[in-house]
Amino acid sequence: MHSVHPLTPDNVSINFAQHLRNFDPDGEKCRKALRKALDHIYDGQRTGRFSIDQVSKTEATHLGTMVEIYLRRTLDGFVSDGERMDFSIDGIDVDCKFSKTRFGWMIPTETVGNYAMVTHANDYERYWHLGFVYVTEEILTKGGNRDRKRSISKQGRQAIAWCWQEHTLPENTLLTLPKETVSLITSHRHGTQRINELFRVAQQRIITRNVIATVAQQADYMKRVRANGGARTTLAPEGIIILGGDYLEQRKIAQVLGITVPNKGEMISVRVSSNCDSQTPNTVSLAAKLWRVATDADPIEHAPTLPTT
């Protein structure tokens, strides 16, 4: 039943992959689970960390466990708890394996003769992949480590039934900003100042709650953004508005202005100018005036008040 050619995915793995694509058609659930697992390990609110290189080797070993936990939670209904392995899919035990390196899964002897869900995420290059494989001796390397764990050989990878390869990982904004920009943000002593700088220098970039928590490193980090004394108040005289995805009207404003529309739990800042008229494209009416995205040539003017619905 389990005689599998080492270079060909078996039918069960192919079915797993197809069923998961049916359950999560665009991979949105899986990619969000991987994003949450990475952010959990960074623990930015307490530590200010935002990359795997900043995490100790001991803490990094827990990343695979966090991936398993978040995938189990996110894919409930597609997977359930396994009897001998991490997951059960269609009554079949499946081991969950994550690797920080591209094809670096370490397979223990007890997984041989079982199925595995293999995953990888690269926060720097913003991609992830996930697939299923029936683990046989034929697909594994001959040598093992001290724990007798082996990796999947280059040829053996052809036995993987991929759900997604090179799929885009949700952006880690602090990783993609220039280092000097991040240094400017983190150079401020107080969380409120760091949040102000974040929205000042990272305009037209999606900022998630996790990024805000990492930069603020304070318990009530969202308070540092609000209009009653937070970044919205501080940056308004500089002509900068902060649009939140939690508000339908603010999402519409972003769309009309022609900038990236924030989703729920996301924000985006942009400097605006009232130097426009009804013929100007991408203008929005706020506080009885028309506004558009400002250019470097536009003078600074006080930003309008935003609707909070």
Question: Where does each model-flagged region fall?
Answer:
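Nucleic-acid endonuclease domains
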Residues: 1-85, 89, 98-309
